[in-house]
């Protein structure tokens, strides 16, 4: 998945492309061969973050770069490892969820892309079952995909990991494979929720503002969303950067440091991609150079 071999394969694949370094692509292929039958059979997470769904996305990115059938075969094995019933797409001990990181949206995206690459109809059927399941989780009274990690359903805080950001990104990334009225409604709903989400709070790309901006930038690139989407996006980027810059400069000051939503509990600036400062850099690159820098949240 994202935090295992899949993440390493994806990074090497993208770096090979950006740096014109085929030796890195070869390393990615070597790593892909480690995703064998035993490794796949031992997967109990299944999701994008740690399981088969994330491995599928990373392997397909590598397959697109290499056209290596052995890489595609491993993605297919991962797809066949996923349970037929989306209600059993459970990450570890969690219940089956909506959303991208541990939920149905990420698995649906992986299956749709796998169908597109392999032509195996079963993956399309499985993805459609997943769509029906996730649509059943949408709560119109909450106007969102509820967070089911606790006993009391509550609206998600519009995040990539569990909320509208991830669902919207997943649907947009598969539009060339599956585009119907229901998908368009879901995309429109997700974009509206993200545009209405207030600035502030966490700034990271996984759970916070950077992820929301990444999603809006991707929608703008695809020509989706309302006419004022670009104005909203760039206005939010400008105000966000002012706040982040001020916070980073004063990160040693407790009061100022708390303004920056990238702080660990010990008030140390986090430096990992998903929770820390690199995610801000990644988001800005996606906005500034969309033809060169792919959305990392899609493992695309």
What positions do the PLM features span?
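Long, well-ordered core segments of solenoidal/helical folds
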Residues: 23-43, 74-90, 125-144, 178-201, ...
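Loop/turn-rich, solvent-exposed surfaces of beta-rich toroidal or solenoidal domains
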Residues: 199-236, 240
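Well-ordered alpha-helical scaffold segments within catalytic/enzyme domains
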Residues: 7-21, 56-67, 106-120, 166-180, ...
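Amphipathic, well-ordered alpha-helical segments in soluble domains
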Residues: 11, 27, 31, 51-54, ...
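Terminal, non-catalytic domain-edge segments
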Residues: 113, 173-181, 189, 193, ...
């Amino acid at each position: 998945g994202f935090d295992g071999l899949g993440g390493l394969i994806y990074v090497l694949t993208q770096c090979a492309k950006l740096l014109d370094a085929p030796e890195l692509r070869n390393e990615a292929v070597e790593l892909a061969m480690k995703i064998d039958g035993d490794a796949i059979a031992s997967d109990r997470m299944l999701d994008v973050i740690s399981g088969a769904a994330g491995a599928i996305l990373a392997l397909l990115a590598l397959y697109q770069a290499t056209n290596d059938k052995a890489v595609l075969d491993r993605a297919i094995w991962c797809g066949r490892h996923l349970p037929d019933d989306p209600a059993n797409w459970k990450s570890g001990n969690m219940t089956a969820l909506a959303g991208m990181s541990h939920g149905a949206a990420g698995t649906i995206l992986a299956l749709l892309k796998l169908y597109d690459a392999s032509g195996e109809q079963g993956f399309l059927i499985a993805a459609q079952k997943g769509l029906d399941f996730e649509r059943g989780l949408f709560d119109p009274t909450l106007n969102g995909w509820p967070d089911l990690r606790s006993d009391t359903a509550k609206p998600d805080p519009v995040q990539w990991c569990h909320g509208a950001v991830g669902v919207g990104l997943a649907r947009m990334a598969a539009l060339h494979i599956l585009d119907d009225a229901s998908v368009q409604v879901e995309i429109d709903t997700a974009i509206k929720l993200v545009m209405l989400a207030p600035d502030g709070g966490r700034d990271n790309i996984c759970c916070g503002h950077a992820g929301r901006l990444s999603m809006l930038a991707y929608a703008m690139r695809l020509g989706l969303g309302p006419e004022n989407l670009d104005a909203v996006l760039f206005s939010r980027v400008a105000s966000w950067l002012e706040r982040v810059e001020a916070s980073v400069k004063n990160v040693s000051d407790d009061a100022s440091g708390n303004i920056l939503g990238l702080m660990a509990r010990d008030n140390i600036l986090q430096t990992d991609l998903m929770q820390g400062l690199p995610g801000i850099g990644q988001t800005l690159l996606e906005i500034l150079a969309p033809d060169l820098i792919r959305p990392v949240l899609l493992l695309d």
